[in-house]
Swiss-Prot record:
Keyword RNA-binding: yes
The encoding gene: Cpsf6
Name of the protein described by the UniProt record: Cleavage and polyadenylation specificity factor subunit 6
Gene Ontology CC, one term: mRNA cleavage factor complex
Family recorded in the similarity comment: Belongs to the RRM CPSF6/7 family.
Record PANTHER family: CLEAVAGE AND POLYADENYLATION SPECIFIC FACTOR
GO biological process, one term: mRNA alternative polyadenylation
A Pfam family the protein falls into: RRM_1
InterPro entries noted in UniProt: CPSF6/7, CPSF6_RRM, Nucleotide-bd_a/b_plait_sf, RBD_domain_sf, RRM_dom
Subunit structure: Component of the cleavage factor Im (CFIm) complex which is a heterotetramer composed of two subunits of NUDT21/CPSF5 and two subunits of CPSF6 or CPSF7 or a heterodimer of CPSF6 and CPSF7. The cleavage factor Im (CFIm) complex associates with the CPSF and CSTF complexes to promote the assembly of the core mRNA 3'-processing machinery. Associates with the exon junction complex (EJC). Associates with the 80S ribosome particle. Interacts (via the RRM domain) with NUDT21/CPSF5; this interaction is direct and enhances binding to RNA.
Post-translational events: Phosphorylated. Phosphorylated in the Arg/Ser-rich domain by SRPK1, in vitro. Symmetrically dimethylated on arginine residues by PRMT5 in a WDR77- and CLNS1A-dependent manner. Asymmetrically dimethylated on arginine residues by PRMT1.
Length: 551
């Protein structure tokens, strides 16, 4: 009978696993690193939530209710109670959390697992802690929120999906607000009854309603103004836009650059390096493009920045501190100057990452005395990766200084460039002749001029054979130019002839019309004379008839 019950439980688990695989079919190709460090468990969250959070190991209560054994085999066979500890800074390590728990008298810690971003391996600001007794869990929930870890009061909650989703949503909102926030804002986000994570920091916000006393930080300050006041012994929040690294003592600035004022941050610990720098407009989780901006030399492990109030990012002069204040450098591209106050970069030569940090997102340690740059980028003389101005390949502007500075060419290179010049010359001449025969003299002249300039700019332009090519091109050019000018004069002459012929025709026409007009008037006058003569004759005839009648 017991075997039957076991078979039923096993089939129930298989069904759940198949359902989970059907639901999360698009997440089969997940990084192997996440599969190794995270215990697998079934949860009913949406697929988009699974992209941002690690899987939740089953608690003791879930094991009793489902009657199924956990997928991960633990070495500890006794009782196990899981808790969430949140509101931690992103640089809080498992050693820090272990020391804080041991200071409360809790020594039965079974597991500490930090929740991290899969994009860059950075901590989300909360962890899963497993203890071996109810008394230890109650002690943690009662006493740990009263302690401070790096200026933050931890929040302890039971381990269930509700609190996990709240932590994840809060971390996600912080990530989006940190990426979309403006550059150079001074002061933390506005205060209220419900505190949020400060922009730019991962997992630093307070859990809503977990610890009484309202918000930890005061209201926002306008950009360019002085920072808001903070209580004694409490560090101000970090500036927005990207998770900044803990800076060390500033070194000498590079030539022509001005270092920004030092920022307050966490002490640099040897067991947890800072995450990579996030520049504005860069896709989240991709390595920085081009060389990294030069930063201060790395501090000695175990020593952090000296105490004292940090200078403001912009606005009035900073208060006196251990280091003399420096004015911030001019605003510009993030790759041309040292890291501005809102983009502090990680110090080079950082120690290897802690066990819960993905080592694939951090570069290997380099020389601790020199600023690092991306191995794929050009040397830091030109931050935009432009080549030296004198290197222009086979073709460049003519000049004696450049010819003397060039290294001598080998025979193979010389022949290759010479063959190229011959091909350019022959093709240009043939095309120019065809264009000129078609009457397109402008295109022919332009083709020859371009070919001459290309051959003159080559590395072998001083050779006699190259000069012969240039002279042949110039002769062809002069011939086409003279032909184009001659055709123009012939056209002018023909036009003049046409004009003269038209003038003669017009003159002839005018003279003919005048003659015709005169002839017409002559004819008219003759007709008038004839009519007059006829009238006279009639009058005479009438007079004669009258005289005859009177007789």
């Amino acid at each position: 009978m017991a075997d039957g019950v076991d078979h039923i439980d096993i089939y129930a688990d298989v069904g759940e696993e198949f359902n989970q695989e059907a639901e999360y079919g698009g997440h089969d190709q997940i990084d192997l690193y996440d599969d190794v460090i995270s215990p697998s468990a079934n949860n009913g969250d949406a697929p988009e939530d699974r992209d941002y959070m690690d899987t939740l190991p089953p608690t003791v209560g879930d094991d009793v209710g489902k009657g199924a054994a956990p997928n991960v085999v633990y070495t500890y066979t006794g009782k196990r109670i899981a808790l969430y500890i949140g509101n931690l800074t992103w640089w809080t390590t498992d050693e820090d959390l272990t020391e804080a728990v041991h200071s409360l008298g809790v020594n039965d810690i079974l597991e500490i697992k930090f929740f991290e971003n899969r994009a860059n391996g950075q901590s989300k600001g909360f962890a899963l802690v497993g203890v071996g007794s109810e008394a230890s869990s109650k002690k943690l929930m009662d006493l740990l929120p009263k302690r401070e870890l790096h200026g933050q009061s931890p929040v302890v909650t039971p381990c269930n999906k509700q609190f996990l989703s709240q932590f994840e949503m809060q971390s996600r909102k912080t990530t989006q607000s940190g990426q979309m926030s403006g550059e150079g804002k001074a002061g933390p986000p506005g205060g209220g009854s419900r505190a949020a994570f400060p922009q730019g920091g991962r997992g630093r916000g307070r859990f809503p309603g977990a610890v009484p006393g309202g918000d930890r930080f005061p209201g926002p300050a306008g950009p360019g103004g002085p920072p808001p006041p903070f209580p004694a012994g409490q560090t101000p929040p970090r500036p927005p836009l990207g998770p900044p690294g803990p800076p060390g003592p500033p070194g000498p600035p590079p030539p022509g650059q001005v270092l920004p004022p030092p920022l307050a941050g966490p002490p640099n610990r040897g067991d947890r390096p800072p995450p990579p720098v996030l520049f504005p407009g860069q896709p989240f989780g991709q390595p920085p493009l081009g060389p990294l901006p030069p930063g201060p030399p790395p501090p000695v492990p175990g020593y952090g920045p000296p105490p004292g109030p940090p200078p403001p990012q912009q606005g009035p002069p900073p208060p006196p501190g251990p280091f003399p204040p420096r004015p911030p450098g001019p605003l510009g591209p993030p790759l041309t100057l040292a890291p501005p106050p809102h983009l502090p970069g990680p110090p080079p030569g950082a120690p290897p990452p802690a066990p819960h940090v993905n080592p694939a997102f951090f570069p290997p340690p380099t020389n601790s005395g020199m600023p690092t740059s991306d191995s794929r980028g050009p040397p830091p003389t030109d931050p935009y990766g432009r080549p030296p101005p004198y290197d222009r390949g086979d073709y460049g502007p003519p000049g004696r200084e450049m010819d003397t500075a060039r290294t001598p060419l080998s025979e193979a290179e010389f022949e290759e460039i010479m063959n190229r010049n011959r091909a350019i010359s022959s093709s240009a001449i043939s095309r120019a002749v065809s264009d000129a025969s078609a009457g397109d003299y402008g295109s022919a002249i332009e083709t020859l001029v371009t070919a001459i300039s290309l051959i003159k700019q080559s590395k072998v332009s001083a050779d006699d054979r190259c000069k012969v090519l240039i002279s042949s091109l110039q002769d062809c050019l002069h011939g086409i130019e003279s032909k184009s000018y001659g055709s123009g004069s012939r056209r002018e002459r023909s036009r003049e002839r046409d004009h003269s012929r038209s003038r003669e025709k017009s003159r002839r026409h005018k003279s003919r019309s005048r003659d015709r007009h005169d002839d017409y008037y002559r004819e008219r006058s003759r007709e008038r004379e004839r009519h007059r003569d006829r009238d006279r004759d009639r009058d005479r005839e009438r007079d004669r008839e009258r005289e005859y009648r009177h007789r």
